[in-house]
Amino acid sequence: MRMHTRLQFLKRVSNVAYSHGQEQAKKEKVYKEMTQLKSQINRLCRPCPWDWTVFQGNCYFFSKFQQNWNDSVNACRKLDAQLVVIKSDDEQSFLQQTSKEKGYAWMGLSDLKHEGRWHWVDGSHLLFSFMKYWNKGEPNNEWEEDCAEFRGDGWNDAPCTIKKYWICKKSAMSCTEK
């Protein structure tokens, strides 16, 4: 009988070890599947919302309808963005080309606070190096034109009350694993 009890005991130990091994294999399988899912999610990650365009770490929204400059500023705020503030020549080139395809569009530049002193909606002033982007003879304030738009191959000042397309900008999200 003693031998029989010993065999039963060994059989139970063996079953426990086998069960433990199966549990470990299940855990490893779940971990592997989880790692694969994380990898797939990262590939699906979008740094910008749908209908936005990514360029050099920023997201740009090109409106599908027109409104005046102030309403455009507010529309961008509602999207947790701002009417586009241009920070580089590359960005200017990208926006100018894209806006040419879509139509005249507001940017976040105006001289509403003080005539002739152009400021971006983020409070920064227009750099001298960007003056080259004004179309010939612009800005001219011909008709109380205090807001800037993309027009043709450059910038134009226009009355802020005119309805135009508009471009919002915000930082792109990171898709890296944390």
Swiss-Prot record:
Start and end residues of each C-type lectin domain: 54-169
Keyword annotations from UniProtKB, A to Z: Calcium, Disulfide bond, Glycoprotein, Lectin, Mannose-binding, Metal-binding, Receptor
GO molecular function terms noted in the UniProt entry: D-mannose binding; metal ion binding
UniProt-listed Pfam families: Lectin_C
Glycan-bearing residues: N70
Keyword Glycoprotein included in the entry's annotation: yes
Positions bound to Ca(2+): E138, N140, E145, N156, D157
SMART domains xref list: CLECT
The UniProt record lists the keyword Transferase: no
Top-level taxon: Eukaryota
Gene3D superfamilies: Mannose-Binding Protein A, subunit A (3.10.100.10)
Cystines in this chain: C48-C59, C76-C168, C147-C160
Record-given protein name: CD209 antigen-like protein C
Organism field: Mus musculus (Mouse)
